[in-house]
């Protein structure tokens, strides 16, 4: 997360090291702070795809940098020990650290549905509870993943046969899907507007729900049954070409960079628009040395280098969190939730009721508490699209927070 900190200011940050101290009690994922990336020790990913009528394929990805590797003696290799659960099924996953190992450690298992749910009786399964425990750190992360039913969707795969574990892919990547021989599909796409959400006190409607993807190619599945397409910017869909009614079986969002990372100078400048004046922003965009202009902005806010480094770490750390948790048809930092998360930080409390999220800052019920309500809204290209309930009363609170940023009075989450 901190690579861009040293890149902007020229300050060096050490890598985040995994601790070696065993905790006495099991550390669980922090459901009270679901959008605080740093409050979770492990960030595994899992994809579940039916393998047949009575089995399911589960694909795990675990970041090796987040696991604790130990060895029994100076001559022994370093190994990690993970315990995984898929529903009721439990197994141990041991990984030996070798030179040149990739960042992500992968594990694939095919399980009978009765192993996952002992009471299974042939019914359709829509989601599966998963968990991974680092036995050497005594840390556990549990989550639920949807089952990508082949009747309703065609999972997207990378060239190595591993499924896409998000709905985002870098523009220019080639994705694959498996379909019956002779079936015909349309690949369509639409670029997404790059506008920012209006402040909490201003009402300007988002237009991403008016996108109309255009057909870019027609794909006829051959004897291998494997088909491919190149990811284009914005919304990419695969639709049944022979269906009387539009039947979309795959949706992928094409981004110029890995969607959760903030490494590009243009993105760094664009995402700080929430706390800049219009003139400051236009000056950075038009500057012949945009990096120097961005440096100058942060140093001017903080008044001294070390403070600027901390503010950069906090701000762009929140941008990355917004991308991880809120990205859909829009990049996470461009969404209503992303905007509030970046400027205000991690809420003191989050309440989720039905199709709403209530973000509470400060002591709930007190006169100084600030509450934002986000409503889940129907969107043709995003099933997790939330809109902020805006109100002119937020003007004072918003201006105060922006002023705090500009005066260097922001504390890390």
Regions found by a protein language model. Give the residues of each.
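Conserved structural position at the C-terminal beta-strand
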Residues: 132, 240-241
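Conserved, compact domain cores that house catalytic/ligand-binding motifs in diverse enzymes
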Residues: 170-207, 269-333
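A cross-family detector of function-defining hotspots
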Residues: 286, 294, 298-333, 337-383, ...
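Short, surface-exposed beta-strand/beta-hairpin micro-motifs centered on an aromatic residue
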Residues: 224-229
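Bacterial N-terminal signal peptides
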Residues: 8-19
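Intrinsically disordered, low-complexity terminal regions enriched in Ser/Thr/Pro/Gly
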Residues: 21-213, 220-222
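Short beta-strand elements
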Residues: 137-163, 244-274
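Positively charged n-region of N-terminal signal peptides that target proteins for export
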Residues: 1-6
């Amino acid at each position: 997360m901190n690579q861009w900190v040293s890149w902007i200011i020229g300050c060096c940050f050490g890598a985040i090291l995994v601790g070696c101290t065993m905790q006495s009690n099991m550390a669980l994922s922090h459901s009270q702070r679901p959008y605080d990336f740093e409050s979770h020790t492990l960030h595994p990913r899992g994809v579940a795809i039916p393998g047949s009528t009575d089995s399911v394929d589960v694909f795990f990805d675990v970041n090796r940098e987040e696991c604790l590797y130990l060895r029994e003696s100076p001559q022994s290799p370093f190994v990690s020990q993970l315990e995984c659960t898929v529903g009721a099924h439990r197994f141990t996953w041991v990984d030996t650290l070798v030179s040149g190992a990739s960042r992500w450690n992968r594990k694939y298992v095919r399980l009978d549905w009765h192993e996952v749910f002992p009471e299974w009786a042939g019914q359709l399964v829509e989601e599966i509870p998963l968990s991974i425990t680092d036995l050497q750190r005594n840390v556990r992360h549990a989550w639920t993943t949807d089952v990508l039913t082949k009747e309703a969707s065609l999972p997207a795969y990378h060239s190595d046969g591993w499924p896409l574990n998000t709905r985002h892919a870098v523009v220019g990547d080639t994705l694959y899907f498996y379909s019956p021989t002779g079936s015909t599909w349309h690949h369509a796409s639409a670029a997404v507007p790059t506008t920012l959400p209006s402040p909490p006190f201003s009402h300007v409607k988002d237009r991403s729900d008016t996108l109309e993807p255009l057909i870019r190619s027609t794909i006829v599945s051959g004897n291998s049954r494997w088909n491919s397409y190149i990811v284009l910017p914005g919304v990419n869909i695969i639709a049944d070409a022979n269906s009387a009614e539009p039947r979309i079986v795959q949706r992928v969002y094409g981004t110029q960079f890995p969607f959760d990372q903030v490494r590009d100078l243009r993105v760094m400048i664009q995402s700080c628009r929430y706390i800049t004046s219009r003139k400051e922003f236009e000056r950075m965009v038009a500057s012949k040395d945009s990096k120097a202009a961005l440096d100058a902005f942060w140093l001017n806010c903080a008044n001294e280098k070390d403070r600027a480094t901390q503010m950069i770490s906090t701000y762009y750390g929140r941008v990355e969190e917004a991308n991880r948790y809120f990205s859909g048809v829009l990049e996470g930092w461009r969404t209503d939730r992303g905007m509030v998360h970046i400027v205000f930080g991690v809420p003191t409390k989050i309440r989720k009721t039905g199709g709403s999220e209530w973000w509470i800052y400060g002591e709930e019920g007190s006169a100084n508490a600030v509450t934002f309500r986000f409503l889940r809204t129907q969107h043709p290209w995003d099933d997790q699209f939330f809109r902020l309930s805006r109100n002119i009363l937020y003007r004072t609170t918003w201006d105060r927070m922006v002023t705090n940023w500009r005066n260097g009075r922001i504390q890390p989450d």
